[in-house]
A protein has these predicted regions:
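Short, surface-exposed acidic-centric catalytic microdomains
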Residues: 40-102
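Structural motif
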Residues: 29-30, 122
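Short, solvent-exposed loop/turn segments at secondary-structure junctions
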Residues: 36-40, 53-54, 90-93, 128-132, ...
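Short glycine-/acidic-enriched loop or helix-start segments at secondary-structure transitions
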Residues: 41-44, 133-136, 166-167
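C-terminal capping/extension of enzyme domains
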Residues: 1-29, 51, 97-111, 139-185
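Internal catalytic-core helix/loop-beta-alpha segment
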Residues: 80-134
């Protein structure tokens, strides 16, 4: 995969960058990677802010919590449970919120990101199609000194997007509960 630079794609009218950085609570033990922020998330400067996305509904179920709809409430919940968030794509051309429309992605430097997360026990990648394909292409995932260790601690989960009609909310809740509760202290 040819490495794309921001300079090559920034003149496109559908070019977007990750407006806000990774959410990295101190002592985070879980890293959840999505694809790229939706327009609602970019407008609200935080992850999974589209009201149709089921991420926080599922997380509330798993954690037996009830965080509100405000970014600050959601950050508090994530800090409490040592959950870090970021995305696989840092910049791309995307005309809408559909992952399948991501073009010319600039991928996260996973090795650099994990330097800031020394206590990570597990990485969860949300999305069994586009995000998984993009994650597997991350150069630092393959070129790092310990790629096997990353593979051992990486689990792919279904997307919480409302567009994911293959997984009704109750099935997402059970799948996430099974996987996340192994690592939540």
């Amino acid at each position: 995969m040819k490495k794309v630079t921001i300079e090559e794609i920034q003149s496109d009218p559908n070019f977007h960058t990750h407006k806000f950085g990774p959410f990295l609570p101190r002592n985070a033990q879980i890293l959840i990677l999505g694809s790229f922020p939706s327009p609602s998330s970019r407008d609200n400067n935080f992850y999974y802010m589209d009201q149709r996305n089921r991420f926080y509904k599922v997380l509330n179920y798993v954690l037996q919590e009830n965080c509100g709809n405000e970014a600050d409430d959601r950050k508090k919940l994530l800090r409490k449970h040592r959950i870090a968030l970021y995305d696989v794509v840092e910049a791309c051309i995307i005309p809408d919120a559909k992952d399948s429309n991501i073009k010319m992605p600039i991928l996260v430097d996973l090795q650099e990101l994990l330097k800031n997360l020394p206590h990570i026990k597990q990485i969860f990648v949300l999305g069994l199609t586009t995000t998984k394909k993009l994650f597997i292409k991350i150069p630092s995932f393959h070129n790092c000194s310990k790629p096997v260790e990353y593979e051992k601690i990486t689990t792919f989960l279904p997307s919480t997007s409302s567009a994911n009609i293959r997984f009704p909310t109750d099935k997402l809740e059970e799948k996430f509960k099974t996987e996340l509760t192994k690592y939540i202290s």
